[in-house]
Regions:
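A short helix-turn-beta junction within AAA+ P-loop NTPase domains corresponding to the substrate/partner-engaging
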Residues: 208-225
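Sensor-1/coupling segment of RecA-like P-loop NTPase cores
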Residues: 149-151, 155-156, 164-211
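Conserved small helical "lid"/interfacial subdomain of P-loop NTPases
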Residues: 224-251
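A short, basic N-terminal segment
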Residues: 1-41, 59, 245
Length: 255
């Protein structure tokens, strides 16, 4: 590694330390087709837990699809729908012809289109030809489930910075349509879509899930524990050793 330790992005494998319990819990929940929420301050390790869990499931031979939509710059309904749709479609196809075919197949009767000029200019797979309405939201939210059912494979949809949906005037309608979908979940169905909801603005996430009680009993919350100091120290020491340097454990402790 170029630096003693990774700190500027999510980590998996040998760079992932601690929180094995959280990974086990998340894996079991995904195996059961549950929807998951976790939140904490920025850079607290949310995405590392998610990615390590998926890494572990791949290593154990599990077959699944994954879409990751970062909502960090979402400020309105249209931006959310396009981010969501683009992530979901791109995760299961790879060419312009395939993108257009999937949008035509799954999003018929909506205002969603595949715009080749938008795709060429900004890599936008799903575009809108009109102001979105609730039918558009309804069909878009259900898109991962339809793909999972047809391909007979679980589909995990990661929504990062989920709290930003509240910046859209229609956020209440969006949440209620998501709740409707979550209530319809069939635990006996082997191929279903599971949403992994992550948020970095703790107060906003608490407002959604604890104060207003959206998704009440429809999602399972994973609480992140503090990484043990001993694991952190060992990781730092090993990181310096890889780069040919030695650091005393007492120095790491600040003694």
């Amino acid at each position: 590694m170029d630096t003693p330790f990774v700190y500027d992005r999510f980590v998996t494998g040998k760079n992932f330390i601690g929180r094995k319990t959280e990974c086990t819990i998340m894996s079991n929940l995904l195996e059961s087709g549950e929807h998951i929420v976790l939140y904490g301050r920025p850079k607290s390790g949310k995405m590392s837990i998610v990615q390590q869990t998926l890494f572990n499931r791949r290593m154990s031979g599990r077959q699944f699809m994954v879409a990751h939509a970062s909502l960090s710059n979402v400020r309105n309904l249209e931006q959310f729908l396009l981010k969501f749709g683009t992530a979901v479609i791109k995760a299961v196809s790879s060419t312009a012809v395939e993108y257009e075919a999937l949008i035509t197949k799954y999003l018929d009767g909506t205002h969603f289109v595949f715009d080749r000029s938008r795709f060429a200019s900004c890599d936008e797979v799903v575009s809108l030809n009109w102001t979105p309405d609730m039918n558009d939201v309804y069909k878009m939210i259900r898109l991962p489930q339809r793909i999972a059912e047809e391909r007979c494979r679980p589909y995990y949809v990661i929504l990062e910075d989920f709290q930003n949906i509240m910046l859209a005037e229609e956020y209440d309608d969006v949440f209620k349509l998501m709740e409707e979908l979550f209530r319809e979940r069939n635990r006996m169905q082997p191929a279903s879509a599971s949403f992994i909801i992550a948020g970095s603005q703790v107060n906003a996430m608490k407002f959604i899930f604890e104060e207003k009680k959206y998704f009440y009993r429809l999602v399972e919350k994973i609480t992140m524990s503090t990484v043990d100091d001993r694991e952190i120290i060992e990781y730092i020491v090993k990181g310096f050793m890889v780069s040919g340097k030695v650091i005393e454990r007492d120095l790491v402790l600040g003694a």
